Amino acid sequence: DDASDRAKKFYGLM
């Protein structure tokens, strides 16, 4: 879902 994708992008930023 979008929320999961958003979290993944956030983690990828780290």
Curated annotation (Swiss-Prot):
<comment type="function">
    <text>Tachykinins are active peptides which excite neurons, evoke behavioral responses, are potent vasodilators and secretagogues, and contract (directly or indirectly) many smooth muscles.</text>
</comment>
<feature type="modified residue" description="Methionine amide">
    <location>
        <position position="14"/>
    </location>
</feature>
<keyword id="KW-0964">Secreted</keyword>
<comment type="similarity">
    <text>Belongs to the tachykinin family.</text>
</comment>
<dbReference type="GO" id="GO:0005576">
    <property type="term" value="C:extracellular region"/>
</dbReference>
<dbReference type="GO" id="GO:0007218">
    <property type="term" value="P:neuropeptide signaling pathway"/>
</dbReference>
<keyword id="KW-0878">Amphibian defense peptide</keyword>
<keyword id="KW-0527">Neuropeptide</keyword>
<keyword id="KW-0027">Amidation</keyword>
<protein>
    <recommendedName>
        <fullName>Ranamargarin</fullName>
    </recommendedName>
</protein>
<dbReference type="GO" id="GO:0006952">
    <property type="term" value="P:defense response"/>
</dbReference>
